[in-house]
């Protein structure tokens, strides 16, 4: 959804997207991401595949990040919503990488037990590659973190979903409806909530 938002945000100049593992294996994420870009008519957007596992720092994604940091030194903002292996790889390729990046926004980490409808959830993004995470947190500048705990403060209800996405023929809205409608049934059945975080 973050990528969908950026694709539709006129204020953002999206330079590219890199795939990483975490919620699934890199090959599945890569295929899903490319299918989404194709279905949305965004195949001209540069997309690069990242490392497949912890510490796999040599990747097209890491090289792309270094190239973008060099080309847009002091201007580049990075949003990382998965494991941080690609950023760790960029730092391995260029020890001055983080000095060239304007800001980094991360989704990951927990600050207290993450309880989701009486179920304790494990942290995912930072724990996938602790070494890469340590590099980003200690070497990066202007790093903001949106933790799992922060995410639980905002529930996207079925009513809000209908209000924003039904009754429009906007291609992005149609795509989101087609790809996310099942989340409501899943969350209601598994967690007893009428929405998702």
Kindly give the residue locations of the regions a language model identified.
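N-terminal acidic, glycine/proline-rich low-complexity segments
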Residues: 1-197
